[in-house]
From Swiss-Prot:
UniProt-listed Enzyme Commission number(s): 3.4.21.88
Example GO biological process: DNA replication
GO molecular function term, any single one: serine-type endopeptidase activity
Protein name: LexA repressor
Active site feature: S152 (for autocatalytic cleavage activity), K190 (for autocatalytic cleavage activity)
Top-level EC class as recorded in UniProt: hydrolase
Keywords for this protein: Autocatalytic cleavage, DNA damage, DNA repair, DNA replication, DNA-binding, Hydrolase, Repressor, SOS response, Transcription, Transcription regulation
DNA-binding region extent: 26-46
Signal sequence region: none
Family, per entry: Belongs to the peptidase S24 family.
Classification via Gene3D superfamilies: Umud Fragment, subunit A, Winged helix-like DNA-binding domain superfamily/Winged helix DNA-binding domain
Coiled coil spans: none
Segments of this protein annotated with the region Disordered: 79-98
Amino acid sequence: MLTKKQLDLLEFIHKRLQADGVPPSFDEMKLALDLRSKSGIHRLITALEERGFIRRLAHRARAIEIVKLPESLGGEPTVGFQPRVIDGDRPDRPRPANAEPVTIHAVELPVMGRIAAGVPIEAISQVSHQVAVPGSMVGKGEHYALEVKGDSMIEAGINDGDVVVIRETSTADNGDIVVALVDDSEATLKRFFRRGASIALEAANPAYETRVLPSDRVRVQGRLVGLIRTY
């Protein structure tokens, strides 16, 4: 039996994983549950982990997996339910002798180069190579992939060297992680917020300042839907 706060937090994490492919930060959890400190979130996370509803992944920034869901949130995840984060093994890593082959419908996406998760870099529009992603990750619409350069989104679980999967769109809701084109020349991966006639591009790393620009200087090029990480 979960308390109301535990259930509310689990639902919030689940919805963010479904929407963004990455879990919310502790600050976002604190605001969503109207708590005064992060210590309350730590206690709730620990309780959910002890009860087997979530799993924290070691040595990764803000990495949480949902293991199961209570009936009030739709029951346990169906077969194949996974956060939309792919941890890829190195190609030279030996396969266990008892490993069974698994067939997954894959889609080839163009990797359009590197995107800055830091100071914006020049916009890239040339395909460097292709990457295979599960078909369930992309859904409808046009998609492409970008390799992340920088550490400004580490608290969103996005690290330097990760490959992000982007759905093409020219619109975004507040809080979406987007590919933003600044002045038609610089591309950056940031969280999007509309502030009146301006656009705020917010990093997920306190070392980076939020950039607030007139809306006519920013064009949304796509929204984050998944992430691929190789060790």
